[in-house]
Amino acid sequence: IDFYIETPGGSGTAAEEIARFLRKKFESVNFVIAGEAKSAGTILALSGDNIYMTETGSLGPIDAQVKIGRSIVSAHDYKAWIDEKRIEASTTGRLNPLDAIVISQISPGEIYGVVNSLEYAKDLVKKWLCEYKFKTWNITKTRKVRVTPEMKQERASYVADLLCNHMEWRTHGRSLKIDDLQELIVIEKIDDDKKLADIVYRIKTVLKLIMSGSTTYKI
């Protein structure tokens, strides 16, 4: 199946359920992206055998966003801050009074929840890349070396860690275009095939018209 996806993001668990459903029904799953497929949309796209993108298409960082108090924050940033303060406390024996007040209001459950949210996205991406996207990756592009299962796992971990690294992208809403991603994973460029590009752009236009000019809702 060729699955056209366009979403600003959503639930990682929903992405997992959709991926499982598609894999039960279809032997090969390809994702087509002409708009944005951010956050959970990126996680889902990485479960595909192939990713096809236009120049207008974009993926995004997959660092989990968690609710802490009244704010939604990056799980990666939150964990990094906690780790930084832990090291500071063990090194100097004390904390800045303001930091101490903030930390005193954080429960162990919140910390574990943040860590689990972050690792959940990584686990999905690492598993799916090895099983599907890297399934036919047998020879390296530059050195022409045979690809081992360990090499696939190492590469999958690198991709997952990088996409989860909020410090790398600075904002969860960052748009990652084909040129940003080609060194990371292989993405097929739709615009290189004029006939295919015309079909995909028509689909994109029709869907936008349906969503904006009718009573149809995206759930």
Residue ranges with predicted function:
Residues 24, 29-64:
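A generic, well-ordered mixed alpha/beta core segment in the N-terminal half of proteins
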Residues 1-30, 52-54, 65-219:
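N-terminal organellar transit peptides
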